[in-house]
């Protein structure tokens, strides 16, 4: 897709901050363009709490030193393709609102694996980027989807009380997908996410 996913910021419980980034910034790090002195380390914008974040200026890669990306197979691509080696990625194929708590997805230093939410609780971050829902939107009602997503976000907020939480929209699908998804439903659910 040529359009970046939009994001919604959740203010941290113990700090108000104008430091907000869009997923466009995250995806812009994938390009091989060199960093320059014109790039900032922290984007600035006037987005209100809970509103979509506008695209902001490009940031240096060190902006993501204290960031974590949480999600399913789409998010896994960040580590798979080594887009941002300095950010942590807690993601796995097929992760949904249930398996984020149970599926042993994250490899520990000792070789064992633990669920994403257990791994998230082990370290404090300044920025948490969340992209979930693609594995649910095909079958869940909007109300059920929002209740489950909201529960996961509440748990993330409790674990990361000082972090800014960015809820990224689900990406569109091609016409030939086999998962009961269509872009109209994805758009509907993305709009509904704005109310969380």
Features from the language model and the residues they span:
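Charged helix-capping and loop-helix junction motifs
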Residues: 142-152, 183-189
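N-terminal, intrinsically disordered, polar/charged segments of Gram-positive cell-envelope systems
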Residues: 2-66
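N-terminal cationic-hydrophobic initiation segments that often serve targeting/anchoring roles
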Residues: 120, 153-158
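Alpha/beta-hydrolase-fold catalytic nucleophile elbow
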Residues: 131, 168-169
């Amino acid at each position: 897709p040529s359009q970046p996913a939009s994001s919604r910021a959740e203010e941290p419980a113990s700090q108000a901050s104008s430091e907000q980034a869009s997923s466009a910034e995250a995806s812009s790090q994938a390009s091989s363009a060199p960093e320059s002195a014109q790039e900032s380390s922290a984007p600035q914008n006037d987005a209100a709490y809970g509103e979509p974040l506008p695209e902001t200026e490009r940031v240096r890669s060190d902006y993501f030193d204290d960031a974590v990306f949480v999600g399913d197979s789409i998010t896994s691509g960040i580590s798979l393709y080594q887009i941002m080696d300095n950010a942590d990625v807690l993601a796995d194929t097929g992760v949904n609102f249930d398996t984020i708590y149970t599926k042993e997805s994250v490899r520990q230093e000792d070789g064992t694996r633990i669920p994403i939410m257990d791994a998230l609780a082990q370290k404090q971050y300044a920025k948490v980027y969340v992209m979930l829902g693609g594995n649910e939107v095909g079958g869940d009602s909007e109300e059920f989807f929002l209740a489950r997503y909201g529960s996961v976000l509440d748990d993330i907020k409790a674990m990361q009380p000082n972090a800014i939480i960015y809820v990224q929209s689900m990406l569109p699908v091609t016409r030939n997908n086999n998962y009961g998804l269509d872009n109209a439903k994805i758009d509907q659910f993305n709009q509904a996410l704005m109310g969380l």
